[in-house]
């Protein structure tokens, strides 16, 4: 909306059609003529006030069992994991995660990638590292010395393909992107380990003794 108002201002000032204006880097450019003016210069003295109200559509009613669908937007994602496994020591290195994900509309590509990589790191932790060990009601690994978290050294190479399917009922068509990787990265990694070792893995995280014993 701000961009449209700014285009209208520039078009009125220079006698142009606002539909032929685009933003390139930090400039407003006339696609049909020579005009190129910085956004900061074009916005000097311009006051734009815009109020926008968005309300999510209502979620479904609960059924007779007290259950219902609380989601207002759905995102779809696929993951493929590549792992190196030392079958004698039971050690696993997640080498690469390839993923394609429905992101709605990408509003900030760099932040989007950060969300994807963060979700992948969480899923990796659940797959091969993070576990609270309890014995007789006592947590045996109460510190980060014993409770292992993924670090930058554990992070795999990520191949990410965003699929933009804007949600027509969400602000700017955006969807949540950090949560889906947390869900499907874990089974992708476990499936890759199972394929590499032939071991029928039935729990997470996958421990060395699950592989080599």
Tell where the protein language model's regions lie, with residue ranges:
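C-terminal catalytic domains of large/alpha subunits in multi-subunit enzymes
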Residues: 1-213
């Amino acid at each position: 909306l701000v961009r449209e108002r700014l285009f209208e201002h520039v078009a009125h000032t220079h006698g142009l059609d606002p539909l032929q204006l685009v933003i390139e880097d930090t400039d407003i450019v006339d696609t049909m003529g020579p005009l190129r003016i910085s956004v900061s210069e074009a916005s000097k003295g311009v006051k734009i006030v815009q109020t926008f109200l968005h309300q999510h559509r209502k979620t479904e009613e609960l059924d007779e069992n007290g259950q219902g669908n609380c989601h207002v937007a759905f995102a779809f994602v696929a993951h493929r994991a590549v792992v190196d496994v030392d079958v004698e020591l039971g050690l696993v290195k997640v080498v690469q995660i390839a993923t394609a994900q429905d992101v709605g509309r990408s509003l900030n590509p760099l932040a989007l990638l950060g969300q994807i990589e963060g979700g992948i790191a969480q899923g990796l932790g659940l797959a091969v590292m993070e576990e609270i060990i309890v014995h007789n009601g006592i947590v045996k690994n109460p510190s980060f010395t014993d409770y292992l978290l993924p670090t930058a050294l554990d992070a795999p190479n990520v191949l990410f393909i965003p699929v933009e399917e804007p949600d027509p009922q969400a602000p700017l068509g955006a969807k949540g992107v950090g949560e889906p990787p947390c869900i499907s990265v874990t089974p992708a990694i476990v499936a890759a380990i199972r394929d590499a070792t032939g071991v029928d893995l039935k729990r997470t995280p996958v421990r060395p003794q699950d592989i080599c014993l």
